[in-house]
Amino acid sequence: MPKIETRTEPMVINMGPHHPSMHGVLRLMVTLDGEDVIDCEPVIGYLHRGMEKIAENRTNIMFIPYVSRWDYAAGMFNEAVTVNAPEKLAGIPVPKRASYIRVIMLELNRIANHLLWLGPFLADVGAQTPFFYIFREREYIYDLFEAATGMRFINNNYFRIGGVAADLTYGWVTKCRDFCDYFLPKVDEYERLITNNPIFVRRLQGVGKISREEAINWGLSGPMLRASGVKWDLRKVDHYECYDDFDWDVPVATEGDCLARYIVRIQEMRESVKIIRQALDGLPGGPYENLEAKRMLEGAKSEWNGFDYQYIGKKLSPTFKIPKGEHYVRVESGKGELGIYLIGDDNVFPWRWKIRPPDFNNLQVLPQLLKGMKVADIVAILGSIDVIMGSVDR
């Protein structure tokens, strides 16, 4: 009887761009040999809106409402880096109270970012129940944002050159302390529910490994880098805002797999609560914005130095000119290094506004992580990277 010969050839399938686990409009062209992934090509650009060009045709004050749409899970970080770039270039100091308020907002947004990552990631790997718990906790953070800024998820429009738009409202500090007391036991609950679950551990342990050297060579940052054993956090490295005033640690893992990335983010939420508590306890008095910013920029002979204006809050002018020069400024967002390369030419509009999003670099490593893995691991590995396509495509 003749032997039947089975011929197999690679098959190319498209995952996305409209797929429930693609974390935005991302398309993956995956080459398969049976269940094994041979190659993967991410196709991006579906959410490109020309944010850099928009920035070059807006004043800094006008552009702040736009920026929370890059990474719409972490709008405060986008606002922070947007005002930090002109501040550093113009040499505008930020009052201590404003810096503390900024840190509180950034750390709340870091927790919200990690929660928004954790819920869908667990749903991707088959755990549906924690998804609803996590969104419950996120609501409390958005309530705090709403009380301070008037908006919840995005478009907070809260950060300003030289400070913040408004002081914290009456009772806000107490409400934030209550959230910290409420949230830490919930993180313990997540750990009991998820971290010690043998099915979850077997699903992620050893999957999507990346070594320390590879992580550095690929230009990874944030939890992706720290999960591979590199203790690199811009809050410690660049000493921006007032993070040096607080006692906190940089969570690190050495395994470099999906489970390590999960553990690093869980520990980061604990550290963020620690920072928020210290900032609330040490919140100084004084102005919440630099009232001298306008006088400093206009110079000694400005009318703003006159007697008539000495009792008026000298807020930053809407026609603030970005000084001539260039500067790269970065912050540690929930996903990694978020940077702005700014070139000013003594005009109200920037000459160049280059955005360096963290998840764009982190997404580049995906084809390497997927090679040799199973189809079922694609979603788990992609979810562990934490990408937001608004930030990747800009």
UniProtKB/Swiss-Prot annotation:
Q: Which domain of life is it from?
A: Bacteria
Give the EC number(s) under which this enzyme is classified: 7.1.1.-
Q: Does the keyword NAD apply?
A: yes
Enzyme class of the recorded protein, top EC level: translocase
Annotated membrane topology is:
Peripheral membrane protein
Q: From its record, what is one biological process in GO terms?
A: photosynthesis, light reaction
Single GO term (MF): NAD binding
Q: Which reaction does it catalyse?
A: a plastoquinone + NADH + (n+1) H(+)(in) = a plastoquinol + NAD(+) + n H(+)(out); a plastoquinone + NADPH + (n+1) H(+)(in) = a plastoquinol + NADP(+) + n H(+)(out)
Any one annotated GO CC term: plasma membrane-derived thylakoid membrane
The answer to whether keyword Thylakoid applies is: yes
Q: Keyword annotations for this protein?
A: Membrane, NAD, NADP, Plastoquinone, Quinone, Thylakoid, Translocase, Transport
Coiled-coil regions in this chain? none
What does the similarity note say? Belongs to the complex I 49 kDa subunit family.
Q: What does this protein do?
A: NDH-1 shuttles electrons from an unknown electron donor, via FMN and iron-sulfur (Fe-S) centers, to quinones in the respiratory and/or the photosynthetic chain. The immediate electron acceptor for the enzyme in this species is believed to be plastoquinone. Couples the redox reaction to proton translocation, and thus conserves the redox energy in a proton gradient. Cyanobacterial NDH-1 also plays a role in inorganic carbon-concentration.
Name the NCBIfam families on file: NuoD, PRK06075.1, PRK07415.1
Give the matching PANTHER family: NADH DEHYDROGENASE [UBIQUINONE] IRON-SULFUR PROTEIN 2, MITOCHONDRIAL, NADH-UBIQUINONE OXIDOREDUCTASE 49 KDA SUBUNIT
Fill in the subunit field for this protein. Answer: NDH-1 can be composed of about 15 different subunits; different subcomplexes with different compositions have been identified which probably have different functions.
Q: What is this protein called?
A: NAD(P)H-quinone oxidoreductase subunit H
Its ancestry begins with:
Bacteria, Bacillati, Cyanobacteriota, Cyanophyceae, Acaryochloridales
Q: Which gene encodes it?
A: ndhH
